[in-house]
Swiss-Prot record:
Organism (species): Pyrobaculum arsenaticum (strain DSM 13514 / JCM 11321 / PZ6)
Catalytic reactions of this protein: uridine(13) in tRNA = pseudouridine(13) in tRNA
Keywords for this protein: Isomerase, tRNA processing
GO molecular function, one term: RNA binding
Protein name: Probable tRNA pseudouridine synthase D
Gene name of this polypeptide: truD
Enzyme class per UniProt: isomerase
Length: 413
């Protein structure tokens, strides 16, 4: 095990499980370097080259989509508009990477006779189905990733060999928080703490190197209290900042100004805070021992049920995603997790005391990353990796073990 750099620690990822030297290298140098193919619950791969599905009589249409450098949510909205249906009638099994080539299924309620032309998008097939696409319909994703311009190929190979047998922590990856401006979890934590001043500081007074000049200037103005000037300076794509500033400029108190931000965005912040807390829990659990060896007091998943570990019970170690309705581990594991909550200043009851629409319920997540069909090939200074991950797990968590980036943004993360 090796200590992670400050950037990772700020996201709750305190460790690498591999004790190898940093390989360096760049991911996503082009979208074709990061290929994501959805794997359905029955094991069928929705391959870039096409897939055959068995149609069923019903009220939905499943569409095979291959997108390149296209945001999933924006694609769904555009498709809904083109087909004349509500965005609520368009669904996916999971959000795919934008800076990638991604092959997956989108479902639309009703029959679809023709599909629009959308730049960066190919439609390869359509099937009538008796149900919509949803997270329960997919197992996960198959990844084919090329790591370019590797500085130390020997370090990459050593790390990848170690990963074949290592119990890799199932952290929430960089993209959950952002690499240019990693503050979503800080905004969520401020909401949980009911601290509007902390929220304001995270949104406007934390300014990062790789932000655009316009964004930096606007944040500086906002941080100084020049709300109207900041509102005029922020480009229109900064929806949440502009919504917050608009109310501040109108004289709202800070908490009610925050509530002017669209609810779905505020919910993303709370979920990011839950993800950050999970990462910290996982780091604390790593300090107590390997993730594939349950300890007394651990929670384990056995046959789809979560129970406290007992000798001979077996199962996979799980940790709580903090929120209402979850159990905490017992013993020294539970003590370590409660210590994290105290350090972060988050009351376990805070998740239920949120305003309507923001109440956060907890869940359980496997501590160990479940990696399938793992292989790699070295081609000069490039390394190609192939593997399958269950939905909700992040490919970048595996890649960081080899690259070990001090500044993830510079490596394409």
């Amino acid at each position: 095990m090796r200590e992670a750099p400050p950037f990772d620690k700020a996201l709750g990822m305190y460790y690498y499980v591999t004790d190898t030297c940093p390989s360096g290298g760049v991911i996503k140098k082009s979208p074709e370097d990061f290929v994501v193919e959805e794997v359905l619950a029955d094991g069928t791969v929705v391959a870039v080259g096409g897939v055959e599905l068995r149609p069923r009589v019903g009220g939905w249409t499943w569409i095979h989509v291959v997108k390149r450098n296209v945001d999933t949510i924006r694609l769904m909205i555009r498709l809904a508009k083109a087909l004349g249906v509500s965005p609520r009638e368009v669904s996916v099994g999971g959000i795919k990477d934008t800076r990638a080539v991604a092959s997956h299924i989108i479902s639309v309620r009703g029959a679809v006779k023709g599909l629009p032309e959308i730049p960066g998008v190919k439609f390869l097939g359509m099937w009538s189905m008796d149900r919509p696409m949803s997270p329960s319909e997919i197992y996960g994703n198959r990844f084919t990733i090329v790591l370019r311009d590797v500085e130390r190929v020997d370090c990459a190979v050593e790390a990848l060999e170690a990963l074949k047998s290592a119990a890799v922590p199932n952290y929430y990856g960089y993209q959950r928080f952002g690499t240019i401006r990693p503050v979503s979890h800080l905004l969520g934590r401020a909401l949980l703490r009911k601290s509007p001043e902390e929220f304001f500081d995270a949104m406007f007074c934390k300014i990062f190197e790789h932000e655009s000049a316009a964004a930096k200037k606007a944040r500086e103005l906002a941080c100084r209290g020049e709300y109207q000037k900041a509102l005029e300076t922020f480009p229109r794509r900064f929806v949440e900042e502009r919504a917050f500033l608009r109310r501040l400029a109108q004289g709202y108190d800070m908490w009610n100004a925050i509530m002017g931000i669209p609810l779905q965005i505020l919910r993303i912040y709370v979920e990011a805070a839950q993800s950050y807390l999970f990462n910290r829990f996982l780091s604390a659990r790593l300090e107590l021992g390997p993730l594939d060896k349950p300890l007394e007091g651990d929670l384990v998943e056995v046959g789809g049920q979560v129970a406290y570990y007992a000798e001979g019970l077996g199962g996979d170690v799980v940790l709580p995603v903090a929120g209402a309705g979850v159990r905490m581990p017992r013993g020294k594991v539970g003590e370590a997790l409660l210590k994290v909550m105290k350090e972060e200043g988050v009351d376990p009851a805070a998740f239920l005391k949120m305003p309507r629409g923001l109440k956060a319920y907890g869940s359980y997540r496997r501590a160990r990353l479940e990696v399938g069909d793992f292989s790699y090939a070295v081609r000069g200074r490039d390394v190609e990796l192939r593997f399958v991950l269950p939905r909700g797990s992040y490919a970048t968590v595996l890649l960081r073990e080899a690259v070990k980036p001090a500044e993830p943004y510079r490596h394409g993360f």
